Amino acid sequence: MALTPADVSRIANLARLELSTAEQSDLLVQLNGFFGIVERMRAVDTTGVAPLYTPLSAVQDVSLRLRDDAVTETDQREANQKSAPAVEGGLFLVPRVIE
């Protein structure tokens, strides 16, 4: 799929870009190069290849490295609320700011 100069002008217009003729021709070369790479990737036969979420999983077993969901700190609510001006039911009370 090769783009034409008219395609680049239309894309620039949709993106609200003002490009000079030189910029349009440079962009045309870059975009056609990009689409060339995409076409080469599409041409590769991937039948029977399992999708990877990381290339590393092709060469070694990658498991999710998550820590155990365990409590690591003690409850210090009362100690934290000692310096608060107003507390009720374990919650900080703040002045009403909207009437």
From Swiss-Prot:
The keyword Ion transport does not apply. SUPFAM superfamilies: Glu-tRNAGln amidotransferase C subunit (SSF141000). GO terms for molecular function: asparaginyl-tRNA synthase (glutamine-hydrolyzing) activity; ATP binding; glutaminyl-tRNA synthase (glutamine-hydrolyzing) activity. The keyword Protein biosynthesis applies. It comes from the Bacteria. HAMAP family: GatC. This is Aspartyl/glutamyl-tRNA(Asn/Gln) amidotransferase subunit C. The gene is gatC.
